[in-house]
């Protein structure tokens, strides 16, 4: 299968260069409730970072704060060293952050190809067509359905379309919220295989919130654990997979997330 290649930014060495995305001591409120409590993290170029946590931990709120859907009360968010917090979402998209929210949001009455072109609304160049072909290369079923209204696609196909539309912005960072939600195990493996290929072949930097901790950690390079709006643990994916706490609470026998099904009896106190 021939897949065209998007123009890649130069590689950066972790620890020697500024991260693409920096979140510094962010606090975000839902009404009077503090949903994000002093969160700080980094995403380096060409890496996949995953965020793990139970329901209500603040993962989705964090992505919404980064993408401008919600405004932080405190802290900074930097993209390539420039502050973006508090900006309108369309401005943040133009700066290079694409957000694929949970729930497979597509424009149901537009065709597949029209949905992809909507993803390129911030662009005014002649390479939109070649980028659509790139998306079709990774998601061949979308090429077959390109003239079909998106509302008639299956759940897995809609998820592929949502990811493809996010790619059409040529993002510096692609935010993915629960891409496996509601999908069969076979489709989950297929989509995460494509996510890894997009990272390796196209150099797409990603921040991934995912309920399936096993597949997320085996796809990502680095991970953070959130609890009640705070970052309580961080490390390479290999380190997190080896953690007894992660194994006990998140990784079941079949690799399914155990969040919310039992109480987290930690062997140690988070630092």
Specify the residue positions occupied by each region the protein language model found.
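Glycine-rich phosphate-binding loops of nucleotide-dependent enzymes
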Residues: 2-271
């Amino acid at each position: 299968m021939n897949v065209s290649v998007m123009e890649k930014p130069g590689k950066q060495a972790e620890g020697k260069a500024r991260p693409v995305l920096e979140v510094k001591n962010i606090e975000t409120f839902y009404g009077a409730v503090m949903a994000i409590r002093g969160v700080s993290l980094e995403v380096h170029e060409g890496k996949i970072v995953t965020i793990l946590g139970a329901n209500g931990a603040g993962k989705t709120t964090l992505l919404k704060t980064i993408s401008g859907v919600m405004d932080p009360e405190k802290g900074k968010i930097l993209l390539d060293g420039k502050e973006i917090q508090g900006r309108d979402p369309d401005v943040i998209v133009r700066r290079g952050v694409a957000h694929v929210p949970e729930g497979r949001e597509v424009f149901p009455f537009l065709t597949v190809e029209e949905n992809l072109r909507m993803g390129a609304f911030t662009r005014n160049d002649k390479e939109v067509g070649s980028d659509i072909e790139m998306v079709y290369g990774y998601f061949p079923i979308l090429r077959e359905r390109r003239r079909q209204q998106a509302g008639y696609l299956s759940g897995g196909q809609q998820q592929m379309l949502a990811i493809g539309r996010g790619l059409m912005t040529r993002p510096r960072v692609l935010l993915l919220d629960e891409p496996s939600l509601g999908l069969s195990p076979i489709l989950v493996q297929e989509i995460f295989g494509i996510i890894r290929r997009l990272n390796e072949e196209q150099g797409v930097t990603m921040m991934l919130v995912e309920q399936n901790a096993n597949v997320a950690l085996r796809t990502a390079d680095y991970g953070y654990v959130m609890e009640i709006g705070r970052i309580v643990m961080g490390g390479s994916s290999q380190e997190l997979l080896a953690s007894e706490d992660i194994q006990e609470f998140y990784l079941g026998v079949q690799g399914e997330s155990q969040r919310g099904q039992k109480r987290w009896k930690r062997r140690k106190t988070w630092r």
